Amino acid sequence: FHTYDYERHFLSSVSRILRHQVDFNEITLPDRIVKVDSFPMGIDYEKFEKAALEHYKSTSEEQSELQRRLDHHLEATPDAKMILSIDRLDYTKGIAHRIRAYEYFLDKYPEFIEKVRLVMLAVPSRSNVPQYQKLKREVDELVGRINGKFSTVSWTPIWYFYRSMPFENLIDLYTSCDIALLTPIRDGMNLVAKEYIATRTNHTGVLILSEMAGAAHEMNEALIINPNNFDQVAQALKTAFEMPEEEQIQRNKMLQKRLRRYGVEKWAQDFMKALKHTRENRDSFKSI
């Protein structure tokens, strides 16, 4: 499992529903012992860090078209900050909730109108399934309504992409956006949160993360919110905008240290080590 909470709920279900004996994290069956453990998945930290560093060194001729557009918006509105939202278009990701929470934020704090832009990437998922087609229509309508409600001659509140993007463009987004707003209703881990932090090589930027994401258990320095509480999301956005750079650096350095230490290689090593240990215990169990 990704987190201890998931592991604990599974063991509780096995004990209460199936009535099997559970000792700490082991389930005793007539012919074997099943060991349950949690392994929070990491990322290839060095890959994202290196890509971000190379991105900052690139010349204007080497920049992607997306980066040029991002730079154009930054130059046109230098005081405006960009909020990043990246997800598969899936019910569990809470995209519609996030857009409504952003609308609530602009309604509650109108002083941020023209000073913020939500850069939202929704990656197509199960687009042939009617329920997902309905979700896409809902998201399209919400984006259109909010852009129509708040847009000015020189500013649009939501910049919306519905497509997959190559790795280089993801780095463009990670490095250009001041805030990452990731508010899934339920998510096993959410590696985007970790990738965003890994690319912040100057240690600035603020991560706002749903408490429903598995990554929240490892990333306490982020602003952890309930995605269903619009007032809490709005307050977190305001806090992120007003957070001093020194505090951003302090939080991100702690996050980066942890993510670097427990990357995808360490995750795989720990998993295989536990698997090998379980195999040895199984052989011992059979010999009894």
Question: Residue locations for each model-derived region?
Answer:
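Catalytic cores of carbohydrate-active enzymes across secretory and cytosolic contexts
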Residues: 1-288
